[in-house]
Amino acid sequence: MKVGDRHYHTIWLNEDGRSVDIIDQRWLPHDLRVVTLKTVADVALAIRDMWVRGAPLIGVTAAYGVAIAMTKDPSDAHLDAVWDELHQTRPTAINLRWALDAMRDHLRPLPEAGRADAAYQRATEIAEEDIELNRAIGANGLKVIRQIAAKKKPGEPVRILTHCNAGWLATVDYGTATAPIYMAVEEGIPVHVYVDETRPRNQGAYLTAWEMSSHGVPHTLIVDNAGGHLMQHGDVDLVIVGTDRTTANGDVCNKIGTYLKALAARDNGVPFYVALPSPTIDWTVHDGVKEIPIEERPGDEVSFVQGRASDGSIASVRISPEGSPAANPAFDVTPARLITGLITERGIATPSPEGLKALFPERR
């Protein structure tokens, strides 16, 4: 997407053909910083400490991590060790495991001498595939926005609520939940996006609001608990969120707080859609609440908040009493029964085993 006069991806291969650059998202929206990842340790740190985040982008970053590893040691033992090291960084996002499996399955049959070049080629293919998947998701989600817009008065916006950041910053480009929004704007459909702040890391306030501003999308930042109120008063036409893991029966694991938005949407008759590329579907899991591991992140993310101080510096301040413990589950699971549809690159599926297999018959 464009930032100022430049088109950015969130991750790209450097001219040396070996290191990769990323947008370090910890500093947004106040500072756009680019960081170079040169080692597997760099990649693991970037994923674990959320320099990059969002299930698709985590997967792409891990794929490049495997490629970097192959330049140092292309052996089977090292390939397996790197798979384990990177897989442990963020356990909930299924794209991470998918990308690592894709890399290992591609490289294992190859002679060691050719693995490094092949690894970079495959990682780049995964990155390019992500862009195409998101573009297709956008086209399919745009149909939903068009349908709502057709019922509006001329110039009246489609009001969309989104949670966390499932934008281009969570992918290589376009985003999942935001791709239909960007395409609607490009088509001239009036929209207004309500952006949940998304505590505790404020990815809505820091990232989604920044994306909307950069792209010129009308939006309003709201506190996490305001969504239900807006729905009660008829101010939301549509909810679109992303997902870090979707089960074979249509349950969705997404940023903590998504479940509450789905409950409010169901109670108020607001359509609730989830946008996802197919690598986010875990076909081995059939009960999201019971089977998906939920990442527990450090309590300091709840107790402290980062922002720009009055002197212009970026500062972290404590907002809770010293000694008060904080729990920080990073995700929750929204049952399929609360979801209107799953927007994929192949179309919109009903959130059920039958609905998903209708779009992905190879999984029957």
Curated annotation (Swiss-Prot):
Protein keywords: Amino-acid biosynthesis, Isomerase, Methionine biosynthesis, Plasmid
EC identifiers of the protein: 5.3.1.23
Catalytic activity from the UniProt record: 5-(methylsulfanyl)-alpha-D-ribose 1-phosphate = 5-(methylsulfanyl)-D-ribulose 1-phosphate
Biological processes, Gene Ontology terms: L-methionine salvage from methylthioadenosine
Membrane-traversing stretches: none
Function: Catalyzes the interconversion of methylthioribose-1-phosphate (MTR-1-P) into methylthioribulose-1-phosphate (MTRu-1-P).
Protein name per its UniProtKB record: Methylthioribose-1-phosphate isomerase
Species: Rhizobium meliloti (strain 1021)
Gene from which the chain derives: mtnA
